[in-house]
Amino acid sequence: MAPPSPSPSPRVCVTGGGGYIASWLVKLLLSRGYAVHATVRDPCDQKNAHLMQLDGAAESLSLFKADVLDSAALAAAVDGCEGVFHVASPVPADKIADPESEVMVPAVKGTLNILEGKPKDESCWSDRKVCRDNEIWYCLAKTVAEETVWEYAEKNELNAVTVCPCIVLGPQLQRVVNTTSELLLYVIKGGPDVLNDMLWHIVDVRDVADALLLVYEKPESSGRYICAPNYISAKAMLEFLKKRYPDYNYVKCKADVHQNSRITPIVSGKLSDLGWKPRALEETLLDSIEYHRKTGNLQDVEGQTYRLPDIFRHFQAANE
């Protein structure tokens, strides 16, 4: 009989990994068998070179370029980690010209970014007030509808299970282009609006179908299931698509808009625990485009304008 597979190393994040205390913490964690995500301002800076020279670093240490005020970069560093050691904080040696921006904001806001960066799971719900105030009616409707399911199920002793997907992409079976596919076509064809460089949480439509059947067939399934296995920034997605399909116009993206905004990863661990195995994001994007190429949806039509679906209007960059 084959020996059992070794358990994966516990994974943690250390912010400010190149600092005095953090460096020793990284060294200790590596010696105890941890896989470490260390954030540094510049992984190529020689002042951080000592980290990759630590015992075990080649196998178990990953450096992430991240400032404590860049919540999107922090989210990427924290993704997949069981815990976070928030050590990063400015320690000025000289007289401070602007204490508020040089010390207070990085220390306090940076800490808040870490706390708010806790991955969102099934315990988290969309905020009704935020949805209503920003006229995000679809999200509001889905939130209220799901709350209604749970209220009804509790009162009537109904065995209910809900699956909550994010942006759904992938090839279609129906001929009419659906709303989320319109978003992808808008990105590729190059609509008139500039998009924010925000994170997109994406799931393949085929994986959503798998998830729905999985929770139905598994007797142990219960409660809510987040269905959001992948995320990518708008800028990174454009770079990925342009390399493979360089002949399209593509929408413009306002770089670095996501910096200092609250970006929190969404996790689908509960669904994965049931045996759900979603596709890689690259497969979803490429299969989506190949479908639209074959069906002619990517062909330019004279006089046709490409609109951003209203449900995604918050993806649009504000006019300066």
Residue spans for each PLM region:
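N-terminal Rossmann NAD(P)H-binding glycine-rich loop of SDR-like oxidoreductase domains
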Residues: 2-36
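Alpha-helical substrate-binding/gating segment
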Residues: 3-4, 184-193, 198-225
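NAD(P)H-binding glycine-rich loop region in Rossmannoid oxidoreductase-like domains
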Residues: 43-109
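Active-site "gating" loop of Rossmann-like NAD(P)-dependent oxidoreductase/epimerase domains
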Residues: 90-93, 118-136, 173, 188
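Active-site Tyr-X1-5-Lys
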Residues: 125, 129-161
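Glycine/proline-rich active-site loop of Rossmann-fold NAD(P)-dependent oxidoreductases
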Residues: 155-158, 170-183, 215-225
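Mid/C-terminal beta-alpha module of Rossmann-like enzyme folds, strongest
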Residues: 211-261, 289-292, 296-320
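Conserved C-terminal active-site "lid" loop/helix of NAD(P)H-dependent oxidoreductases
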Residues: 239, 257-277
